[in-house]
Amino acid sequence: MALPKLNTPTYELEVPSTDEKIKYRPFLVKEEKILLMAMESKDNAQIIQAVKDIVKSCTFDKVDVSSMPMFDMEYIFLNIRAKSVGEVSKLKILCPDDKKTYADVDLDLTEVSVQVGDDHTNKIELTDDMGVIMTY
């Protein structure tokens, strides 16, 4: 007799750059271990790869993380983390005035959003006759 398969809850969010709705699930213990090992290595490439792998698996392989803007991936990861570990993250913020004092701050991850200015454009002028158009 096979063991029953446990289902994890699924949630939905809107990707900031495309307004596309995607489904996601909280990360599991194995994915949290991958993230913790990457963080312990202090290697940025490993951390980014771990986040990409977690976003890909927690969105049921429906998101192409290799071509996605980094701000979208970070937004999706924050939502996954909020549902997995807790919606409030405790931070210690260095006082910008004296650069010595730390303040404890609770950050509600569900209230984090991508901010786009009114004058934002996907075109970046490099010179008068050369530029780059971002694909997001």
Positions of predicted regions on the chain:
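Short, surface-exposed, charged amphipathic helix/loop patches that serve as local interaction elements
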Residues: 1-136
